[in-house]
Structure formats: C-alpha cells, structure tokens
Design a protein with these regions (language model features):
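Walker A/P-loop NTP-binding active-site region of P-loop NTPases
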Residues: 2-58
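Structural beta-sheet core signal
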Residues: 34-35, 93, 121-123
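Switch II (G3) loop of P-loop NTPases
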Residues: 63-81
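Short, well-ordered alpha-helix to beta-strand connector turns
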Residues: 66-67, 88-89, 116
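Inter-motif core of Ras-like GTPase G domains
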Residues: 77-98
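Conserved C-terminal guanine-recognition region of P-loop GTPase G domains, centered on the G4
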Residues: 102-125, 131-134
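Beta-strand-loop-alpha "switch" segments that mediate conformational coupling across diverse proteins
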Residues: 136-170
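Inter-lobe coupling/hinge region of RecA-like P-loop helicase motors
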Residues: 159-187
Length: 199
C-alpha cells in the first residue's frame, strides 16, 4: 500500500497526520510501514526509527516502492511529487479550518485529481461546527471525495512536544473527552485505509 499525504500549503498538518497514521497502521495491521519525505528538516527524524525513514534531497528522485509506505510530501507539485501521487493507492490531502487554507485545499485537490482520483480529505484541528460548515463549502465547490474530521486536541502536540505516542498517551491516561474523540477519528481514517488495502 502506497499512501501519499500532500498539500501545496505549508502548515496544513500533513506531517502530523503522517506520523499518526504511521503508528496506527502498524499497530492495526501488525505490518511495518516506512515513511519517505521530501522535507529536509522534518520533525519525523526524532519520532521514526532511522531504518524506516528516508529523506529525499531537493534534486533527488523519489523512489516508488511496493512495500507499505507513507509519502509525506509538501510544496510545489513538481514532476517528482506528481509521479509519486500518480502511483499512490491513496492520496490524503489535509487542511485546517481557515479561509486561506481551504482555498489552497481546493487547488491541491484540482492538481491531484488530474492524475489520481483516490483522494481522501482530512480536516484537522476542528472546533464546534467547523466540519459541517467545511463539508457544505466542499459540496458547493463540487468536491465529493471521502472527508474525515480530526478535532482540535492535545493528542498530536503531545506526540511532537513530549515525545508520547498515541499508544503511550492511552497507557498513561492523558486523554480528556476532546482527545478521545480525536483518537477515534484518527482510528477511523486508519480503518478506512486498511479497508482499501483489503479491497
């Protein structure tokens, strides 16, 4: 299974989603997943074992592998990214509730669907009615790809700031109701991907 997480807009939480799915997919499938990123200064270095992480230099080709892999790609959609997106089984396009980010989200979808229509949207850091409003916005713009919500919580910040995996946070009982909801939502995304892997 080749999964690409990409957005043309920096700060869209693609690396956060990549790390969460990397942990959850391995836990659920009992299979090892690798991560390939074109971010030279990625935060993933301190979170993922060296043997499972490959950083791609600016002018280096992105390898297409047949193993279970998550591509964490960002920036302008050059020929390297385009080829990776084309060869992916699923392309996840994350965004956050913001007018500027949603505009970029639409642009990202238009770029990706030229070569791959197996798109999954993730709306991260939502509060209150954000998700319903964004769903309406997407429908008004003719976007019908599967869309998942991840509520605003400390789950992801605990991973990056405290070095606590989702599993470790569960073991330590660090979750409030908002965090538990976010975990349920992240699990739903992982379950959807696993279903696609089997289908």
């Amino acid at each position: 299974m080749k999964i690409t997480i990409w957005s043309s807009k920096g700060g869209s939480t693609k690396t956060h989603i990549a790390l969460c799915l990397w942990e959850l997919l391995q836990k659920k499938t009992k299979k090892q997943f690798g991560v390939i990123t074109n971010d030279v200064y990625t935060d993933l270095e301190s979170k993922i074992p060296h043997k499972q992480l490959l950083k791609i230099a600016v002018n280096e080709d992105i390898p297409i592998v047949n193993d279970n892999i998550i591509y964490d790609l960002g920036g302008y959609i050059d020929s390297r990214c385009l080829n990776t997106i084309k060869e992916s089984d699923i392309v996840i396009i994350p965004t956050i509730p913001s007018v500027i980010y949603l505009s970029s989200h639409l642009s990202s979808i238009k770029e990706v669907q030229k070569v791959n229509k197996n798109i999954v949207q993730v709306i991260n850091r939502t509060k209150k009615n954000d998700f319903n409003e964004i769903q309406q916005f997407l429908q008004q713009n003719g976007i019908k790809y599967p869309c998942f919500e991840v509520k605003e919580s400390k789950v992801i910040s605990n991973i990056f700031e405290k070095g606590l995996t989702i599993t470790k946070q569960l073991e330590n009982g660090l979750f409030n109701p908002y965090s538990k909801k976010a975990i349920e939502q992240l699990n739903s995304i992982a379950d959807f991907i696993i279903k696609e892997m089997k289908g």
